[in-house]
């Protein structure tokens, strides 16, 4: 919505959020797969 105020800060935040979300998803998937394999 506000692209004129922080044009350089938005992409960095989006990249960081995407990276953190990816890491969280990988961690959750790893835990789920490990639980399934161990069971």
UniProtKB/Swiss-Prot annotation:
InterPro entries recorded for this chain? PSII_PsbL, PSII_PsbL_sf
Q: Which domain of life is it from?
A: Bacteria
The answer to whether UniProt assigns keyword Phosphoprotein to this entry is no
Quote the subcellular location field of this record: Cellular thylakoid membrane
Residues passing through the membrane, by range: 18-38
Q: A Pfam family in this protein? A: PsbL
Q: Which GO terms describe its cellular component?
A: photosystem II reaction center; plasma membrane-derived thylakoid membrane
Kindly report the protein's main subcellular placement as a broad class.
membrane
KW ATP-binding (keyword) present: no
Supply one GO BP term: photosynthesis
The record gives the membrane topology as: Single-pass membrane protein
SUPFAM superfamilies, alphabetically? Photosystem II reaction center protein L, PsbL (SSF161017)
Assigned keywords, A-Z? Membrane, Photosynthesis, Photosystem II, Reaction center, Thylakoid, Transmembrane, Transmembrane helix
Describe the subunit structure.
Answer: PSII is composed of 1 copy each of membrane proteins PsbA, PsbB, PsbC, PsbD, PsbE, PsbF, PsbH, PsbI, PsbJ, PsbK, PsbL, PsbM, PsbT, PsbX, PsbY, PsbZ, Psb30/Ycf12, peripheral proteins PsbO, CyanoQ (PsbQ), PsbU, PsbV and a large number of cofactors. It forms dimeric complexes.
Query: Which family is this sequence assigned to?
Result: Belongs to the PsbL family.
User: Its function?
Assistant: One of the components of the core complex of photosystem II (PSII). PSII is a light-driven water:plastoquinone oxidoreductase that uses light energy to abstract electrons from H(2)O, generating O(2) and a proton gradient subsequently used for ATP formation. It consists of a core antenna complex that captures photons, and an electron transfer chain that converts photonic excitation into a charge separation. This subunit is found at the monomer-monomer interface and is required for correct PSII assembly and/or dimerization.
Q: What is the protein named?
A: Photosystem II reaction center protein L
Q: Which gene encodes it?
A: psbL
């Amino acid at each position: 919505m506000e692209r004129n105020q922080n044009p350089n800060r938005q992409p960095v935040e989006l990249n960081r959020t995407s990276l953190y979300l990816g890491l969280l998803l990988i961690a959750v998937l790893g835990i789920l797969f490990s639980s399934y394999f161990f069971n």
